[in-house]
Amino acid sequence: MIQTQSMLDVADNSGARRVMCIKVLGGSHRRYAGIGDIIKVTVKEAIPRGKVKKGQVMTAVVVRTKHGVRRTDGSIIRFDGNAAVLLNSKQEPIGTRIFGPVTRELRTEKFMKIVSLAPEVL
């Protein structure tokens, strides 16, 4: 469950290392974002010569959460940390590689590119 002020790791090679959620998109008073939800983030930590710079406001999709996601069979998939993938204005990933596992819940029409780049799909 990601909310405003939540810090997330970046799971791609866009150049950002840590981002902070500044808005959960999808409703006027929506408080929490889960896996597969789109959020507005600001870059808090970035590497030199990356595609994004510190202080930039970006759109991102949540790919891993500590809270996890419940499957229809009753199992819960949880991760050790919260992570997101940065998106451009066309909702496509900025980076060309994805680090770490992602869940099957991202297998929608919008995020198939992220699933195909990921090394492992749970």
UniProtKB/Swiss-Prot annotation:
Pfam family, one: Ribosomal_L14
Name recorded for this polypeptide: Large ribosomal subunit protein uL14
One of the record's GO cellular component terms: cytosolic large ribosomal subunit
Keywords recorded for this protein, A-Z: Ribonucleoprotein, Ribosomal protein, RNA-binding, rRNA-binding
Organism superkingdom: Bacteria
InterPro entries listed in its UniProt record: Ribosomal_uL14, Ribosomal_uL14_bac-type, Ribosomal_uL14_CS, Ribosomal_uL14_sf
Function field: Binds to 23S rRNA. Forms part of two intersubunit bridges in the 70S ribosome.
Cystine pairs: none
